Amino acid sequence: MRFSGSLESLSTIGDMHKITPLFRFRRTATADTARRRANPILSIGAGIVLMSVALTGCATTATTSSGTTTATSSSSSSASTAATTTEDATTTAETISTTAEAAEAFLATLTDEQREAVLYDYDDETKTTSWSNFPVTFVERAGLNLTDLTEEQQAAAMKVLEALLSDEGYETVTAIMGGDEYLLENSSSTEDSLGQYYIAFFGDPSDTSAWEVQFGGHHLGINASLDGTAGTITFAPTHLGVQPAVYTNEEGEEVQPFDGIYTDAFAFFDSLTAEQQATLTAGDVSMCAPGDTCDFSTGAGLTGADLTDEQKQLLLDVIANWVGLADEETTTEALAEIEATLDETVIAWSGETTYDMSTGDGISFSISGPNVYVAFQAQQGSAGADVDGVNTSGWGHVHTIYRDPSNDYGNSVTQQAATGGMGGAGGPGAGGPGDGGAPPSN
């Protein structure tokens, strides 16, 4: 599915010229907190799906400079309420129930042939290799390509994501998708599948049994395992990528999908002593490939046992950008499990030591422990997607991966090796689309 400016239509917010999607773990929830909800409005023209997300009741912090208003979403801010806003689910059970309902509603829009294509057995190992950082023409995805659906079906598919994800998580995902559409429209890439996304269900949608939502395309691979009986949700494994890191949509709004991750990462880095930073940067940064086997390497680095309580919390804030994509309860429980083994977790860092995208080539870091593996890696290449005046390499091209060595895919399957030689970790200088090399011409 190709999305043009996923944050373009601001229906009730007035003159906002910069939108910076941030993910923040919501530590408190109150009854009067009505967060912004993104409502996909899909239209088809010239074979391209245009997505306009109406943002209402937006919680913002704003500063004014030269007549331009800058708005930054923040989960700790109180939100203005509007009749069209809905609140995030705050419990795991609510998320499972509303996501199952949205999935059933989506299935109801499909033909028998489409239903057969989108539904797999829960223990089908296909799901372990059908997600990737590569565009959809290079790695086969499971399920249905949203470009093959009607407008009604596309809207229903996006409602599944809206039910599954928190507001901040949904904003981050749609901003990633908007960035891929930006590359399609503005870059030198000849890859015409940019901006296309697939959706699949492994197991029947249910609030009483286990099933999975898989959604992804280039620089996006969500694997959400929901188990109503156990009352659990896990997003392990999930791939979030960004290219470019900053882009301007058709409404003139500046979109920064990973600004929240960068802010959290540098808050952690800056909290360290010089000695701790030296140990951290001397460590071994690892990167596992999306949709491939992983040895969850630790290597040398700074351990959780070396951190103060405050530093541990800042590290958990970083991790929450991946494990906390859904509701508050799910996030709290996942972080508690990770915190219990944090002393055994190894963190390593390479690259820049200040958050300044105007200098250097970006950062890479990894966090590897008994039940968490997060890797963040700047790609030293544009993958043939160059844009005049816009950085699409280093800071501007990032791959991330989140996995749980103890609970990938809700322990429903064993990870298989990537097929077709497309399992490369996407390290700096690696070849291939999305990995620093140029995709072949079509």
Please report, for each region that a protein language model flagged, where it lies by residue.
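Residue-identity detector for glycine
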Residues: G5, G14, G57, G67, ...
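A cross-kingdom marker for long, charged
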Residues: D88-D112, E116-D148, A155-S166, E171-N442
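Sec-dependent bacterial lipoprotein signal peptides
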Residues: M1-T56
